[in-house]
Amino acid sequence: MVTILDTINPDAKRVRHPEKAHRPDTEVMRKPDWIRVKAPTSKGYAETRAIVKEHKLVTVCEEAGCPNIGECWDKKHATFMIMGEICTRACAFCNVATGKPNALDMAEPENVAKAVKEMGLSHVVITSVDRDDLEDGGAEHFEKVIWAIRAASPATTIEILTPDFLKKPGALERVVAAKPDVFNHNMETVAGNYLTVRPGARYFHSIRLLQRVKELDPTMFTKSGIMVGLGEERNEVLQLMDDLRTADVDFLTIGQYLQPTRKHHKVESFVTPDEFKSYETVAYSKGFLMVASSPLTRSSHHAGDDFARLRAAREKKLLVAAE
């Protein structure tokens, strides 16, 4: 298990999670066999890493310690994390560093666009840290990144995974107006866990955010994801599904929570593959166009393939409705 120190940047001396340093170590459960993944060693992984470093980019794959980094980077898939690597929030589950962020890098939109073109991406996912310090929460920067990618690689479809833009009037409208192909905002966990797991956020604000996207652009695909294994009850997960469907969300992802350090929220349970399959079945019955539910599912895992299936599912639904 990694320590509280920054383990992403080998030269860093700062504490990665200062707000968690005073906490007692939590119990660490042994991972079941279905969670284990191979260490990244492939040529494709090395090439992707080189491109990321060349353009001085940050990826959520590294910062969040994603277990799928070896598989995704081998295929030259990466999720770019814009607006720096320091977040203004301190969620109990997240491995991204907390603190006072640096000023925005004005060259970042062009650098991201160059990397997308160089990697030949047909679909790209752009996420960010929370930037509560910015007047618009980073909405203009998202807009610039989307525009830069459109200019450099017009055929690439763009998926964004945004923060909640809490108390940032007009921010959401600006991002939606930039016309990403998929708007993703993760609920992360059930309503009853928000005070302990996601204390800086508001459950119904996030639901309303996703609903508002559809009001602004009914044709835009919306997506959200949660982690399980944080002590939630099954009925709470089903209620969250209902809340997302009320907001007309198209795509739901469900994955196992994995504890980054002993200072983070403990894993309360490892949900079995059969339970994930059951959640998938129920979610489809509630009307989601696309559901990805498995222990290693993450928001941007297989995002390009999933987008193709999502688009096909909508076309099929429209054809059926027209008959």
Curated annotation (Swiss-Prot):
Coiled coil: none annotated. It catalyses: [[Fe-S] cluster scaffold protein carrying a second [4Fe-4S](2+) cluster] + N(6)-octanoyl-L-lysyl-[protein] + 2 oxidized [2Fe-2S]-[ferredoxin] + 2 S-adenosyl-L-methionine + 4 H(+) = [[Fe-S] cluster scaffold protein] + N(6)-[(R)-dihydrolipoyl]-L-lysyl-[protein] + 4 Fe(3+) + 2 hydrogen sulfide + 2 5'-deoxyadenosine + 2 L-methionine + 2 reduced [2Fe-2S]-[ferredoxin]. The keyword Iron-sulfur applies. Its main location: cytoplasm. SMART domains: Elp3 (SM00729). [4Fe-4S] cluster 1 binds at C61, C66, C72, S300. Its EC number is 2.8.1.8. Pathway: Protein modification; protein lipoylation via endogenous pathway; protein N(6)-(lipoyl)lysine from octanoyl-[acyl-carrier-protein]: step 2/2. Keywords: 4Fe-4S, Cytoplasm, Iron, Iron-sulfur, Metal-binding, S-adenosyl-L-methionine, Transferase. Its cofactor is [4Fe-4S] cluster. PROSITE patterns: RADICAL_SAM (PS51918). One of its GO terms (cellular component) is cytoplasm. It is found in: Cytoplasm. Binds 2 [4Fe-4S] clusters per subunit. One cluster is coordinated with 3 cysteines and an exchangeable S-adenosyl-L-methionine. [4Fe-4S] cluster 2 binds at C87, C91, C94. One of its GO terms (molecular function) is 4 iron, 4 sulfur cluster binding. This is Lipoyl synthase.
